[in-house]
Amino acid sequence: MKHHLIEHRGEQTPGTAVGMASPDAAEESTGVCWPGGAMRRNESSPRPGPAFLPDDDIYLAARAQGVLGWSSSPSSQSSSEYQSYSQYQSWDSSKSEEQQETPPESVCALYTHVQTVRGVAVAWETDDGFEPVTRKPLIREAEFIKRQRRKGSSFEMASNTDLRWELEDCKHYCPQTEDPVDCCMQELRAPPDWLVTTNHGLRCVACCRVFPTLEALLDHAQHGIQDGFSCQIFFEEMLERKRTRDQKQDQQPVEEEQSLSDSSECTRLLTKVLPWQQQPQQQPQEQQKQQQQQQQKQRQQEQQQHQQQQQQPQPLKQQQQQQQQQPLQPQPLKQQPLQPLQPQPQPQPQKQQQRQQQRQQQPPRQQQKQQPLQQQGK
């Protein structure tokens, strides 16, 4: 038994029929049948354009607990295409309005001059000229117009969503397929500029590709999404870091000046204290000075008493012990004036003295002997 759902106006929707079955049949199988293929069970999916039912009709169909069978017609396909085109047209108009509201911004592409051998960079530009890649390169900047993003996409989350929308834009603006003859002619064309190997070139800091001219590098930085990879996110991140570093360097001297000014103001406030505020501060200072003087006097008295005790006579034993403990100090010798030597009589032995005395006594004895001889001669 089939029933047709009719709108409130009394008109039947063209090309749409809803089949309703008994609740027993609904328990066995519940699914939505599409003409192009089968869907999973109990899975909701978007339905093309005018094939959507009004809210009231869907509510009635749900209460019936039946199986819904959708059948599309050429009119429904054309209406779905019209709906997708209208959605794209509304999105394109909203995008153009956003572009009018936000003026285009510029971003700097980072690159360096290099010398290449078969497309491979072997030396790059430094402050002293072209040197091997082990040295620090001289990085240059070139401005290009920034690619506009959708609202709601953050800077850090770059953006599978942004890339997807841009790829869709490229597909919409791509020219229509040409004849096979034109395709054959395209195969005979020369390779692009960025594939040509030269002795000199410009190397992109983000992707390290070498380009023959600055125009080719800027075109790559702006429309690199067509090749499947965009260097713009890298350039924006590097410039953002550079800005934050410059801001920190600018803030450091300002903070130093503020600290100096604050310290000078504090010193001024301390010097500009009112006299009635100075008096209570002076009183405790005077008390402290008096206390210090008293303490010094007490210390002096104690020292004097200690010295007096040391000067009192000690017993002999203690004095001897102190003398023993004290090391012997050498006394300086006194120099006496030299006196001339005088001959002194050497001591003679007793025997020699006796002999001399005997000799002195001998002459009178000889005289006595000679006298009798003389008398005899007479």
UniProtKB/Swiss-Prot annotation:
**In which residue ranges is the amino acid composition biased (Low complexity)?**
277-339, 349-378
* Entry GO CC: acrosomal vesicle; outer acrosomal membrane
Keyword terms: Coiled coil, Cytoplasmic vesicle, Membrane
Q: Does Isomerase show up as a keyword for this record?
A: no
Primary localization class, coarse: cytoplasm
Q: Where in the cell is it found?
A: Cytoplasmic vesicle, Secretory vesicle, Acrosome; Cytoplasmic vesicle, Secretory vesicle, Acrosome outer membrane
Summarize subunit and interaction data from the UniProt record for this chain: Interacts with GOPC.
Q: This chain belongs to which protein, by name?
A: Protein FAM170B
